[in-house]
Amino acid sequence: MLTRKQHELLVYIDQHLRRTGCSPSFEEMKEALDLKSKSGIHRLIGALEERGFLRRHKHRARALEVLRLPSDAAADRPDTGFAPNVIRGDFTARLQGARAADPAAAITLPLYGRIAAGQPIEALREHQAEIEIPASLVGPGEHYALEVAGDSMVDAGILDGDTAIIRRGETAETGQIVVALIDDVEVTLKRLRRRGNSTALEPANPRYEIRIFPAERVKVQGRLVALFRRY
């Protein structure tokens, strides 16, 4: 049987994963549970791992995976039609095996170059290359890939050199990580926050400031659904 805080954290992580495709940062979990420090989150995650409810994948972006939920939480779990995917082991070997067994197991996405997870860069207009990924990594819809440049999203598990898989779209919910086009010139990867008639682009690194714009100056170009990291 889980404690109240363990139950709250597990349900929060599950809902965040299903809504955004990414596990929440420790700061987000701390705020969601109204705890004073991140050490409490570490203890709760450790307890959930020991009891077989949660798995933490070391050295991987967005490294939390919900293995199961308590029966009461599972019954109330909304059917969003989206389930996050985690790449395990050697990516290249698995993908080659998948292609040999089933050509439909891999899809090709346009790679539009580097996007700033630091200071915004000039908007990317033409794709420079292509990337092949497991089809199971993404859900329905049109997708593209961007290489992350910079460290402003490190607390969200997004590192310099990661490949971000983006679901193309012009809308996103507040709190989701999006590709934002500013003034039709700059493009950046940040967490979106709606603030009345303004839009805030929020980094996940205390070294960077939140940027706030009139809503009409920011256009959503898609939202983050997965990350791919090479070792």
From Swiss-Prot:
Residue ranges of the annotated DNA-binding region, renumbered to this chain: 26-46
EC id: 3.4.21.88
Keyword Repressor listed: yes
Keywords assigned by UniProt, alphabetized: Autocatalytic cleavage, DNA damage, DNA repair, DNA replication, DNA-binding, Hydrolase, Repressor, SOS response, Transcription, Transcription regulation
Entry similarity comment: Belongs to the peptidase S24 family.
GO terms (BP aspect): DNA repair; DNA replication; negative regulation of DNA-templated transcription; proteolysis; SOS response
Assembly with partners or alone: Homodimer.
Site (Cleavage): 117-118
Reactions catalysed, as given in the entry: Hydrolysis of Ala-|-Gly bond in repressor LexA
Organism: Acidiphilium cryptum (strain JF-5)
A Gene Ontology molecular function term of the record: serine-type endopeptidase activity
UniProt xrefs under Pfam families: LexA_DNA_bind, Peptidase_S24
Functional note: Represses a number of genes involved in the response to DNA damage (SOS response), including recA and lexA. In the presence of single-stranded DNA, RecA interacts with LexA causing an autocatalytic cleavage which disrupts the DNA-binding part of LexA, leading to derepression of the SOS regulon and eventually DNA repair.
Sections of the chain in a coiled coil: none
Catalytic residue list: 152, 190
Name assigned to this protein: LexA repressor
Recorded superkingdom: Bacteria
